[in-house]
Amino acid sequence: MQKEYVEVNEGILGSFLGEDVYTMNGNMIVPSDTIITDYILKKLIEFKIYKIFIYKTDPIYGEEFIKNEKISEDQKRYIEDINTVKVMIQDLASGKELDFSKAEDVSEHIYSRINDCVSLMECVNSVRIADEYTYSHLVNVSVYSMLLAKWMGLSKSQIKEVILAGLLHDVGKSRIPHEILNKKGPLDEKEFEEMKKHAVYGYEIIKNNKDISMSVKRAVIMHHEKENGTGYPYGIKGSHKNLYSKIVTAADIFDAITSERVYRGRQTPFTAFKELENIGFDTIDPKVLMIMFTKMPNYYIGAKVKMENGEIGEVVYVPNQCAYAPVVEVNGNFYDFTIDKEVLIKEFL
């Protein structure tokens, strides 16, 4: 997208920053791609930032994007993509071959929104159905993988392959018994051992497809391998994983935490960021994780949230060094989660 250099004033509210903004001392104030809210505008003025780059955007962006009619159409297409994936997985479960054209169609649609990620993320955040997790998870991981690949500077062809890897990473679950996939509670040891086979099953499903690159195939079989070598199916270390698998691993874990499951409710993205920090570099590649922490929180600025005490607020800022601790405005008062550690967000609205 094109950028323009503009003065810092109320006219830029709702716009997206076109580059990282730093203080005179070289400390980042706000990262690129952040939506400019009242809180962020005040922060820019406070640090005497007089001009910045913003993206030239079409009307679906900015402070009014949620109200735009295009969002409802996006949601319809997102649900259509989930249904397409559902048919693809159910066909596999019934013994049919992979219908690669379905995977291609969904992947191409997701890629077509690469410069319209705000509305795409709105779809991911607003449509969450526990019973459809197996199918929506594949679409969501594709979206998150695309974002990570984009932020890491991958080429168009590489980004498309990463999307496909995200979409196919769990196709092996089509061979896992339904009662294990949808068990309302933790798996026992035997069930977990069966569940772990899905990575190999997935590879077996796609290994002879000449339209799928080896990089994508490796991502499918390696997405549960950990950086420290304690993952599965082979227990290899991060140095032996390819970049696609590293990206899909991060996207997979993030969506699993933030999705509605049959055995627990969905967690907020900020809870997910905290869990990812706890998991750390033993599981996820450092570069991928740091990109996620730097860029992804920006998509939740402006989100309406319900606090544990029942108050309704809005996320107005996320510190660059503390992705799990946003600033939330409630009736003109600000909760800074780096300070107000007793205050918790219950859910996104």
PLM features per residue range, with description:
Residues 1-101, 333-337, 342-345:
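Membrane-cytosol interface segments
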Residues 82-349:
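Histidine- and acidic-residue-rich, metal-dependent catalytic cores
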